């Protein structure tokens, strides 16, 4: 309630969301979101008896007191990020062990059912690495359009070429003229995006010059 200056005692929610038969359950990594209706959502990944990882979400409708999980979005996926692309519609953007490109799915019922997105396994290349995704409403950015912002190593082999991309059509396309290369050299590739103000997006990422780098980028430098 005070912008992170003080914190309550931690609460262990493992028993609420983890099936006892699973080997483990992890969040993101990255960030969670608050939906328009106040629902808290975090991306998750778990490994069950098949020993194959699965990405999904967990959510809370009471301010984090209790949490629930339904079904995974796609099997053989791990680190994911979630964004609300329309009121009540969540998009999960996933690291896919099949290599080559990101898996993307949407849900209208908090993960009870999932639909593969048209961009899945085609629009966003990756070297099998974590990525970041945020949704920004038109009223909250200088472009005056609902946008998605994405960052990852923009390659299919090796972790380099950390790039920020913007989609103006709900993630269907990520055009070359709406991208900005931040770091072309080898790095660990993880990143996390946030809006600083209406004109500027911030990115915390593992760069080639430091373990962690924070950079402020003007949206109009990405969308040309």
Question: For the regions a protein language model found, what residue spans apply to each?
Answer:
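Asp-box/BNR beta-propeller blade signature and adjacent active/binding-site loops
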Residues: 1-224
């Amino acid at each position: 309630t005070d912008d992170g200056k003080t914190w309550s005692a931690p609460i262990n929610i493992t028993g609420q969301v983890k099936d006892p038969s699973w080997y483990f359950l992890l969040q993101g990594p990255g960030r969670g979101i608050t939906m328009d209706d106040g629902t808290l959502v975090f991306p998750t990944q778990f490994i069950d008896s098949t020993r194959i990882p699965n990405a999904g979400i967990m959510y809370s409708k009471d301010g984090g007191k209790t949490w629930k999980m339904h079904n995974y979005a796609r099997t053989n996926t791990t680190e994911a990020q979630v964004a609300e692309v329309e009121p009540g519609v969540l998009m999960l953007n996933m690291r896919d062990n099949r290599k080559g490109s990101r898996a993307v799915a949407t849900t209208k019922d908090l993960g009870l059912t999932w639909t593969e997105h048209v961009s899945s396994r085609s629009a966003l290349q990756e070297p099998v690495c974590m990525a970041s995704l945020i949704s920004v409403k038109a009223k909250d950015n200088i472009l005056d359009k609902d946008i998605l912002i994405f960052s990852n190593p923009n390659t299919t082999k090796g972790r380099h070429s950390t790039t920020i991309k913007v989609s103006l059509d709900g993630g269907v396309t990520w055009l070359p003229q709406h991208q900005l290369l931040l770091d072309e050299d080898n790095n660990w590739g993880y990143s996390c995006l946030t809006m600083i103000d209406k004109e500027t997006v911030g990115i915390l990422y593992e760069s080639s010059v430091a373990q962690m780098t924070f950079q402020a980028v003007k949206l109009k430098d990405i969308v040309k």
